[in-house]
Amino acid sequence: MTQRKVRVRFAPSPTGALHIGGVRTALYNYLFAKQNGGDMILRIEDTDSQRFVPGAEDYIIEALTWLGIKFDEGVSFGGNYGPYRQSERREIYKKYVDQLLNDGHAYIAFDTPAELEEKRKEIANFQYDASTRSQMRNSLTLSQEEVQSLIESGHQYVVRAKIEPNEDIHVNDLIRGEVVINSSILDDKVLYKSADQLPTYHLANIVDDHLMEVTHVIRGEEWLPSAPLHVLLYRFFGWEDTMPSFAHLSLLLKPEGNGKLSKRDGDRLGFPVFPLEWHDPKTGDVSSGYRESGYFPEAVVNFLALLGWNPGNDQEVMSMDDLIRLFDLSRCSKSGAKFDYEKGRWFNHHYLLEKSNAEIADLFLPIVESHGIQTTHAYVEKVVGMMKGRVNFVSELWDLCSFFFIAPTEYDEKTRKKRWKEDSAVQLGEFIEQLRAREPFDVEGTENECKAWIESKGYHLGNIMNAARLALVGEGKGPGIFDITEALGKEESIRRIQRAIEILK
């Protein structure tokens, strides 16, 4: 048998913002496909019309595009296996629903929600299965004429899978090994609803995966309990020889490790759980996103890749190309991965440092201008070079280095009490003259000359430098004094020191 080309799919439902766990699933599918020279498909599973949220589909595509997760075919990308939106495949599914009914692997059920609720009250832990289906209104208990009459009179119905009890179903999982589940614990899942003439996830994804020639299904472990049903459906259709390999990914857990990561955890601890900012059209709520929070896409990708997978060594920093080369499903964890959001910040800091000063200046200049400052790209680039090692995000730069653009009008009281001495005003007055006389006004030459002067006068170097920093910055933090003076220029440096002398003397 010839080996089939690897084809994977990411198949989200457009029911809201894409959770970061879903992003990781998409990433792992992409890495696996690219490593094996395969295709990545985007399929939109919009069979649940009641949960459809306008804008969600566009959000999903924009988010994955931002992260560099590229599709070879699918919704918005075209391809030979379309349509790729499940709501556009009604006629395709109906054919396979009829096949299951004709072959005796499914049946029609007319039970109303009220009748089902009554059964749940009557029978503890009720589920619709081989032990209870004989008590219900369905094509197994009604005559063919009664069934036909109900359908023709417009009664809504569902089609349920007919699961026979007492059979061990084997699911071969690429991460977890062989999983065996007895069919007796399975219920007769709904496969199709006449109300909207659409299948449920269980039928639609099996039919689509088969027709789209998907070879590997890589998805979250929440679908593992459904895998036995999916294996049975492949058998019912006679598609066992082309059934894809399964890999069920472990959950992303709360930072504390107790339970699945949720949006509420992000709100509570101050980190996003969505790739992009999300404006909920139903509630008007706005949820933060990694992009808008200042994360670089390569940092998010690197961070997510290591949540539940490792390369087998101590390597942490990996580009997308590195990940494609190293990714191995067998090294995915079976247990959940704690969401370490501080590690995400560390990755962003790393990638920020890797970018050139010019690239960071491109991002920081609009922030500077938003404060009413008119300056040059070259000046911002110089400031960035001094300060980027101190931040995790570009957005943090302003609070650390606004003094490069706005002269201090106040002086930190704690620093003033500690660093401004009785003789600081006199010594800084003399220091000004050293700065005024210095040409060229560079970093190294000015520093060497001023330190030599301080030594010749017998002054304490720390006293003058600390007082000068307070005058130039307004507090006791910042880069080297002579880096600051060179950036500000001679006139501005002198003006700031003179003003501090007048106020603090």
UniProtKB/Swiss-Prot annotation:
Q: Which PROSITE patterns match?
A: AA_TRNA_LIGASE_I
Annotated GO molecular function terms are:
ATP binding; glutamate-tRNA ligase activity; tRNA binding; zinc ion binding
The record's Gene Ontology cellular component field reads: cytosol
Positions that bind ATP? 263
Is Flavoprotein set as a keyword in this record? no
Enzyme Commission number:
6.1.1.17
- Name the residue ranges of motif: 'HIGH' region: 12-22
Q: Which reaction is recorded as catalysed by this protein?
A: tRNA(Glu) + L-glutamate + ATP = L-glutamyl-tRNA(Glu) + AMP + diphosphate
Query: Where mainly found?
Result: cytoplasm
Query: Which keywords does this chain's UniProt record carry?
Result: Aminoacyl-tRNA synthetase, ATP-binding, Cytoplasm, Ligase, Nucleotide-binding, Protein biosynthesis
Entry's SUPFAM superfamilies? An anticodon-binding domain of class I aminoacyl-tRNA synthetases, Nucleotidylyl transferase
The record's listing under InterPro entries reads: aa-tRNA-synth_I_cd-bd, aa-tRNA-synth_I_codon-bd_sub2, aa-tRNA-synth_I_CS, aa_tRNA-synth_I_cd-bd_sf, Glu-tRNA-ligase_bac/mito, Glu/Gln-tRNA-synth, Glu/Gln-tRNA-synth_Ib_cat-dom, GluQ/Sye
Q: Which GO terms describe its biological process?
A: glutamyl-tRNA aminoacylation
Q: Where in the cell is it found?
A: Cytoplasm
The sequence motif named 'KMSKS' region is recorded at 260-264
Q: What class of enzyme is it?
A: ligase
**Family listed:** Belongs to the class-I aminoacyl-tRNA synthetase family. Glutamate--tRNA ligase type 1 subfamily.
Described function: Catalyzes the attachment of glutamate to tRNA(Glu) in a two-step reaction: glutamate is first activated by ATP to form Glu-AMP and then transferred to the acceptor end of tRNA(Glu).
PANTHER family assigned? GLUTAMATE--TRNA LIGASE, GLUTAMATE--TRNA LIGASE, MITOCHONDRIAL-RELATED
Q: How does it assemble?
A: Monomer.
Return the protein name: Glutamate--tRNA ligase
Protein species of origin: Parabacteroides distasonis (strain ATCC 8503 / DSM 20701 / CIP 104284 / JCM 5825 / NCTC 11152)
Q: Taxonomic lineage of this organism?
A: Bacteria, Pseudomonadati, Bacteroidota, Bacteroidia, Bacteroidales
